């Protein structure tokens, strides 16, 4: 009490800032160990594997967001985001490139995030393009959305067969001229 001083008090009324609360909650979630996070997230995860649940930790500010983040990963029939597909359909050659890359994926063994990344990088180097130009099309074709969890571990978690099937199906929807 002796250290208390009225001079340093703010005279304005305090206010509740929901965005700041969400951000702060996200910081607490990110500070959890992976196992603590998985335990807290499990009720919101539709019985997803621990590996898939752990992918969501960096993106979550509230545990209630987990289900929405997981939906495109878990659902093979998840609808494709129109705005994201419109962005990639603007580049005519992207459909051919994603189809070629998908053919490389079909024979990739073992199916790991690291091998997926190497395959994408090698393909980009061969075509003399930046790896980033393939990331949005790959994400949209494999999950249906333009943003989400870290892509390589997500593709690993989805699995080779589901990933290649999704890409084949969506690239034909998005780039109808192929």
PLM ranges: what are they?
Residues 18-22, 50, 54, 132-136, ...:
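Non-catalytic, well-ordered alpha-helical scaffold segments
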Residues 34-129:
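Small-residue-rich helix-loop
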Residues 3, 23-27, 54-61, 137-141:
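Short, hydrophobic/amphipathic alpha-helical patches that form generic packing surfaces
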């Amino acid at each position: 009490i002796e250290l208390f001083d009225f001079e340093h008090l703010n005279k304005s009324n305090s206010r509740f800032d929901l965005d700041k609360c969400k951000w702060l909650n996200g910081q607490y979630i990110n500070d959890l160990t992976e196992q603590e996070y998985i335990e807290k997230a499990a009720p919101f995860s539709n019985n997803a594997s621990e590996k898939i649940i752990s992918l969501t930790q960096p993106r979550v500010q509230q545990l209630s967001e987990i289900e929405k983040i997981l939906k495109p990963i878990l659902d093979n029939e998840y609808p494709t985001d129109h705005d994201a597909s419109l962005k990639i359909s603007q580049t005519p050659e992207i459909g051919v490139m994603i189809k070629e890359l998908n053919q490389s994926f079909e024979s990739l063994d073992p199916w790991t995030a690291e091998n997926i990344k190497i395959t994408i990088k090698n393909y980009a180097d061969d075509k003399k393009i930046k790896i980033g130009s393939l990331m949005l099309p790959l994400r949209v074709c494999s999950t249906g959305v333009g943003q989400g969890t870290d892509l390589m571990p997500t593709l690993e978690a989805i699995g080779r067969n589901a990933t290649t099937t999704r890409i084949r199906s969506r690239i034909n929807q998005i780039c109808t001229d192929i």
